[in-house]
Each structure stands twice: as C-alpha cells, then as structure tokens.
Amino acid sequence: MATVVVIGGGWSGCAAAIGAKKAGCDVILLERTDLLLGVGNVGGIMRNNGRYTATEECIALGGSELFELTDKFTLHKDMDFPGHEHASIYDVTKIEKNVRDLIKSMNIDLRFISRVVDVETDGLTIRSVELESGEKIYGDAFIETTGSTGPMGNCTKYGNGCAMCVLRCPSFGGRVSITSRCGIEDMVGRRNNGDLGAFSGSIKLLKESLSQEVQKELNEKGCAVVPLPENLRNEEKLDLKVCQQYALPEFSENIVLIDTGHAKLMSPFFNL
C-alpha cells in the first residue's frame, strides 16, 4: 500500500489526508504546531456567494466530510453582511477538536509539532522530508499544504512585525517552503503598490470584551455593522487584504463584526 505524506495540517492538508486515505493509501499528516486547521481557527465564513456552489459541488463529488462538520458547528446560517449573502459561520472554538477526532477515526497517522525543514531527493523524486528534530519521514508521494504565511522575517520586512497570530511562529518555528527546497520558485503575490505579500483581513476579539449591545446583535444576527466617523476611515487598508472579496468600501466605512464564537473584526488592523 502506498504511503502519502501530507505536510501541513490546515483545512487543505486535512482534506488532502482524507482524500488520500479514502483512495486506499496509508497517510501521515505532519503539522508544525499543536493544532490542526491553521488559519481556519480564526476563519469561520462558509457558503457565502459562489462558495455555496463550490461547497455543494464538492459534497456531490464525494468530499463531504469536512463540510458536514462546518455545517454541524454552524452558529449562523443564511446570514448577509456587506457584499455577501447567505453565509454560514462555523464556531472556531469547537471546530478543531472535531476535525481532529475525524482524522484520528480514519486511522490517519497525525503527528503534531512536526516542523518539516528540508527534503531528500533523488533526481526529480522526493524520497523523504526531514523534521526539525532530524527525523526523516519516507513516503511514496508527498503533498505540500503549508500555505504561504510567514515566517516572522517576512512579517517584519513586509508587514507590521510579528503579532503572534494563530500560526504562532515564535512558539513552533516558521513555515518552510518545501517547494523551494525542491528547487521550485514560489509564486509571489504583490499589492497594487508593488509591495510583497498581503495582510490577514481580520482581527479576532474576545466577544465578551464588547458592549452588551454589540454582543446582543452578534448573538442574534451574527453580524454587527458600526459606521465609522470620517477621520477613522482608511481605504488604503483594503488593498492589503489577502481576501480581496472583503476589500469593499463598506469595510473601510464601517466596523464590520462577525460572530465566529469570538468576534471577527473585518480589518487587517485598527488603531485603538
């Protein structure tokens, strides 16, 4: 039986591991930190606009497992917010444990705190990947799903510095591009002004730290939109966002909060 090694345990890594297991392979899933889902732990927005069709297509094609979980732990359904309709919002405080339980129930070999730092190749074939500990993990096929975020040096050089985001590079080490270790040049995104990379489009706030009025609106409606005075509006932040579908004027003219279990403030940063 072939062994597939998946590098990175975010949503895409979990999906790849499940797909490989369903195809009859032995699967090893290597995750750099102590949690699955990566930025999915601060995500939450599903089925909005065209994502609804994409979700239903994936389910119809046999890839229902992860969508069943996000649907099961949905806090708000058929929710509208600026520029987006019929969204479902999953609870980020509950989703990771349940994805972890699913992965383990499928007998996928899940290994946390397993930061991959290098590869061993034979010509154009990858033989193994090397962990920070020096251990080598061998396989017949390797799938890189490490994403494109970090490490800290990039956040310092091209951003506002390390804010200890959910990826927690200071604790677990930064992401290493396995494709670049194989000699493949990574695609590099640029902003309109030519700067490299992009910012996360949102900030997570403790919902209980907000006013009772805002909490009530979030709990009941799933979303709160608070108009900003002219002097606090900053349209330049829109160009910084990774998710350009949220780079609409409404997101600079208002504070847009979404209830994901915590409060998701739809802005890359906000001066207090």
PLM-predicted stretches and their roles:
Residues 1-3, 113:
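Phosphate-coordination loops involved in phosphoryl transfer and adenosine-cofactor binding
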Residues 11, 15, 22, 90, ...:
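Conserved active-site and cofactor/substrate-binding residues in soluble primary-metabolism enzymes
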Residues 17, 99-100, 215, 272:
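Short amphipathic alpha-helical segments and helix-helix/interface helices
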Residues 19, 25-26, 31-118, 151, ...:
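Conserved N-terminal/central alpha/beta ligand/cofactor-binding core
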Residues 110-251, 255, 263-272:
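Predominantly flavin-linked oxidoreductase catalytic cores and closely associated redox partners
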